[in-house]
C-alpha cells in the first residue's frame, strides 16, 4: 500500500528485485498481481528482476512469470549469474506478453548480443534438471539449518530468506557490523558488512549459504561474539 501511494506521484516505470537484494525478502505472487494491476491503471510499466528466484522455497508462489499472460505492462528478467554460478557468461533473458514492447527492444538490440558459447552453455545449464534439483536441496537445506541455529542466538534478529543469503540485524549493544565482519574474516570467512546499503548502516550483516562445513565454521564464530 505504501508503494502504491508513492507511485501516485507521476511515475511511469517501476523496477523490482524479487527476491530482493540485499534483504533476501520476497513479494508473493498474489501481492505482485495487485501491484501490477494498480500500475496498469496508472500506465506504469513494471520490470521484475528474478535473478534469485530459483532459491525461493516455493518458486511458483514468488515468480511473476505467469502474470505476463495477464498484464502487458510487465517484463520479468532472469539470468544465470547466481543460481548457475556463471556471472562471466553475461547471459540473461526476459519474458513479457507485450509484443509491441518486445519489438521495440529488438529494434535497439545490438548485433551479436548473444555469442555462440553463451547460447550453447545457456541451453546446457537451463536443461540440467539434476543440477537444479541438487543445488536447491543443498542451498535450501543449509539455509533452513542456519536460520534455525541463528534464531537461538539472542544477539541477532534473523530475517526470512528467499535468496541464497541471510540478512541479520545485530541486537547486542556495542557490537557493530564492522566487528562481526572482522571476527569472521580473521577465520577466513567472508561475509558482507551491510553498512554501505541505505537504511542498513552499522547494524546489519549478511552471508551467502556455503558448503555445510563452512556454514558450521561461521556458526561457531557467531556464537562466540
What are these regions (language model features)?
Residues 73-159:
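PLP-dependent aminotransferase class I/II
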Residues 139-140, 153-187:
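Conserved PLP-binding catalytic core of the aspartate aminotransferase-like
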Residues 4, 30, 186-187, 196-225:
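PLP-dependent enzyme catalytic core of the Aspartate aminotransferase-like
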Residues 96, 168-172, 209-211:
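Short beta-strand-to-loop capping motifs
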Residues 1-10, 22-46, 50-84:
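Active-site pre-lysine segment of PLP-dependent enzymes
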Residues 13-17, 47, 93-95:
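Structural motif
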